[in-house]
């Protein structure tokens, strides 16, 4: 990799909604730019979710070095701060080896924490955390709306973020929004980001989401959920909340038929992709290029070349 003339070191970033073609673009960029692909997806960190998280398969992983994929056990939650610390080390190692770090994923919170920093929230009282985590999500959402109206905009289904906001207000006496206004620890001032925000046509993306889940069933998703459930893990763990786990579990327990299971998982995937699409359309810096085309092989090749050139001339 050529040395940048900038005092900042180059980092490529490929982000966007699920099923948008990010992984294929990242691997192609790694091949032509001597890069290392670094995962920035909250589900793909878990070893137990290779299929349902749509991790690159072994053949894809063999095409370029991959880091932070499947490196966590499902019993071990991976917070944004945890991941950011690991990502900093992975980026530093890639840089030390003379390779281009390539961040790829759809978890905006992970990327925002790494680049712009994290709220310096004090350690949460363990008793308060246990109390909050024991609440049904509906009760936690109602309590949050009453105790911290500033965070009342969280969706009732967003159990993890609701619990986090509630434990923060109860433990610190201040809203999570207050702490989030005082971000620290980001590496944005140290790196030159060459970014591609992938936002393909919505109809194409929805069809890809539906087809992807059908393919996951053929690739072993049912057995993956069976093995995960056999471990008897806390159902509130992030890995247990991953799209597809609850739907397949309900089918395995005879609560719904297969057709309903597929429809529910596909709908959940589309809804998640819609939220990601909205976030990545508006939240990243305006200077980061948006890609609004379908990522076929030809487009992937052209975008990869542009990203390589952007990264190596920053």
From Swiss-Prot:
Gene3D superfamilies assigned: 1.10.20.140, P-loop containing nucleotide triphosphate hydrolases
Pfam families registered for this protein in UniProt: IPPT
Cystine bridges: none
Positions contributing to substrate binding: 18-23
GO terms of molecular function: ATP binding; tRNA dimethylallyltransferase activity
Family according to the record: Belongs to the IPP transferase family.
Protein name: tRNA dimethylallyltransferase
């Amino acid at each position: 990799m050529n040395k940048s003339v900038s005092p900042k070191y180059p980092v490529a970033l490929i982000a966007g909604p699920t099923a948008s073609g990010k992984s294929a673009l990242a691997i192609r960029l790694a091949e032509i730019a001597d890069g290392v692909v670094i995962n920035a997806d909250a589900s793909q960190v878990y070893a137990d979710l290779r299929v349902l998280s749509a991790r690159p398969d072994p053949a894809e992983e063999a095409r370029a070095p991959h880091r932070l994929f499947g490196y966590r056990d499902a019993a071990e939650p991976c917070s944004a701060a945890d991941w950011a610390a690991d990502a900093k080390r992975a980026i530093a190692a890639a840089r030390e080896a003379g390779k281009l770090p390539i961040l790829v994923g759809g978890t905006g919170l992970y990327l925002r924490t790494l680049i712009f920093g994290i709220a310096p929230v004090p350690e949460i009282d363990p008793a308060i955390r246990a109390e909050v985590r024991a609440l049904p999500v509906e009760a936690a959402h109602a309590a949050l709306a009453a105790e911290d109206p500033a965070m009342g905009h969280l969706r009732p289904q967003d159990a993890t973020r609701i619990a986090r906001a509630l434990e923060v207000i109860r433990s610190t006496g201040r809203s999570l929004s207050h702490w989030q206004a005082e971000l620290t620890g980001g590496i944005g001032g140290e790196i030159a980001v060459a970014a591609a925000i992938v936002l393909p046509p919505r109809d194409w993306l929805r069809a890809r989401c539906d087809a992807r889940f059908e393919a996951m069933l053929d690739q072993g998703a049912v057995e993956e959920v069976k093995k995960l459930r056999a471990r008897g893990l806390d159902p509130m763990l992030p890995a247990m909340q991953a799209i597809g786990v609850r739907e397949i579990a309900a089918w395995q327990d005879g609560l719904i038929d297969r057709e309903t299971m597929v429809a529910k998982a596909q709908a959940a995937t589309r809804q998640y992709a819609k939220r990601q699409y909205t976030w990545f359309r508006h939240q990243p810096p305006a200077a980061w290029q948006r890609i609004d085309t379908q990522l076929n092989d030809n487009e992937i090749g052209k975008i990869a070349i542009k990203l390589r050139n952007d990264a190596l001339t920053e």
